[in-house]
């Protein structure tokens, strides 16, 4: 274990974020990067779309490299912010990658070669002991953030919120020497207005109790090699959702080509969501 990982877990707060998976009526973009249609215009609260579930045979947890993860101390509650896109004048966009099921050497090589700061929203059930892979993936200025223990919907009454949100805080702090500050909820459930006020408050209370300050949504999606954007094309401040799938390396190449044509560059989300 590296010296940085031996630092142990820093105090963290439980973060709960909700992402709903529906199909959005937004413009599609082919892998060539050319917009096919431009229907979506709401940049503050887009229609939820784009989140997939884990395979049904996915394990419910991944063993930590440490025998005794340090507990994350509780901290004072703070208001959880939900972000669909970043308001900035900088010519930047944000690459965010969910789950962790496929550990593609080609995708890792691409982000390393091009020094891409990726924000990894890691599901603990997907790690399968390959902690180093995700550490290397985020080492170009990115970060490893929280996508729950086992990808359960946070709006389901049967989902134990503290376990799904706060337990990864402890594990990732132990493994990576940093407590996540962002949560991306599976399926987007809880991030949109479809969540009941009561459940939203419950999620926010748990998330804020263990260090989460932001529930990060998205307004752009890469899926099966194609792209969709709420604003019709890749734009300044966009948060683009990717998944660790076999098509990831090609999708990263495509979005970087789009960005070059539009005068944009990828930036670390941690630089803009404090």
Set out the residue ranges of the language-model regions.
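C-terminal motif of bacterial Sec signal peptides marking the signal peptidase cleavage site
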Residues: 18-21
């Amino acid at each position: 274990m590296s010296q940085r990982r031996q630092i142990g877990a820093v105090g963290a707060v439980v973060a709960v974020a909700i992402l709903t998976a529906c199909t959005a009526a937004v413009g599609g973009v082919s892998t060539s990067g050319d917009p096919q249609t431009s229907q979506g215009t709401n940049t503050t609260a887009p229609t939820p779309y784009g989140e997939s579930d884990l395979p049904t045979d996915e394990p419910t947890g991944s063993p930590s490299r440490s025998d005794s993860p340090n507990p994350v101390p509780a901290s004072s509650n703070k208001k959880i912010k939900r972000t669909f896109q970043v308001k900035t004048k900088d010519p930047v966009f944000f690459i965010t990658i969910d789950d962790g099921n496929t550990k593609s050497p080609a995708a890792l090589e691409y982000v390393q070669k091009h020094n891409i700061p990726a924000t990894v929203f890691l599901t603990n059930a997907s790690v399968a002991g390959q902690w180093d892979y995700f550490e290397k993936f985020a080492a170009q200025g990115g970060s490893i953030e929280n996508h729950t223990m086992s990808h359960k919907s946070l709006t389901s009454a049967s989902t134990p919120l503290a376990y799904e949100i706060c337990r990864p805080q402890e594990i990732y702090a132990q493994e990576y020497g940093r407590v996540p500050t962002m949560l991306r909820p599976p399926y987007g459930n809880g991030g949109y207005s479809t969540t009941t006020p009561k459940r939203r408050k419950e999620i926010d209370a748990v998330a804020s109790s263990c260090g989460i300050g932001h529930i990060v949504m998205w307004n752009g999606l890469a899926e099966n090699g194609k792209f969709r954007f709420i604003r019709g094309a890749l734009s300044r401040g966009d948060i683009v959702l990717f998944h660790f799938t076999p098509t990831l390396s090609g999708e990263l190449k495509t979005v970087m080509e789009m960005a070059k044509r539009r005068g944009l560059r990828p930036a670390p989300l941690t630089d803009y969501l404090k």
